Amino acid sequence: MARMVQCIKLNKEAEGMDFAPLPGELGKRIWNQVSKEAWAGWLKQQTMLINENRLNMADPRARQYLLKQVEKHFFEGGADTAQGYVPPPAE
């Protein structure tokens, strides 16, 4: 049976992740409060941030920036968005 969490991002009970996606306290917090579906949404946004801002993931400052963004995305009311990104129209 899948582990269920009350997802802080989707505001509903949903399937939880199988393991903490990050080390440390932030990873535990995400594992306990974020669903697989919400994490998948973050990964898409993270990819856009990396690409649009041309982040070099070998640079510790880029990694710190993304850690702050993931915390803002789930727990502080919104992370940065890719500059100039316009979501596709709803069908």
From Swiss-Prot:
It holds the Pfam family Iron_traffic. GO terms for molecular function: iron ion binding. One of its GO terms (biological process) is cellular response to oxidative stress. InterPro entries: Fe_traffick_prot_YggX, Fe_traffick_prot_YggX_sf. One of its GO terms (cellular component) is cytosol. Keywords: Iron. Could be a mediator in iron transactions between iron acquisition and iron-requiring processes, such as synthesis and/or repair of Fe-S clusters in biosynthetic enzymes. Belongs to the Fe(2+)-trafficking protein family. This is Probable Fe(2+)-trafficking protein. It comes from Polynucleobacter necessarius subsp. necessarius (strain STIR1).
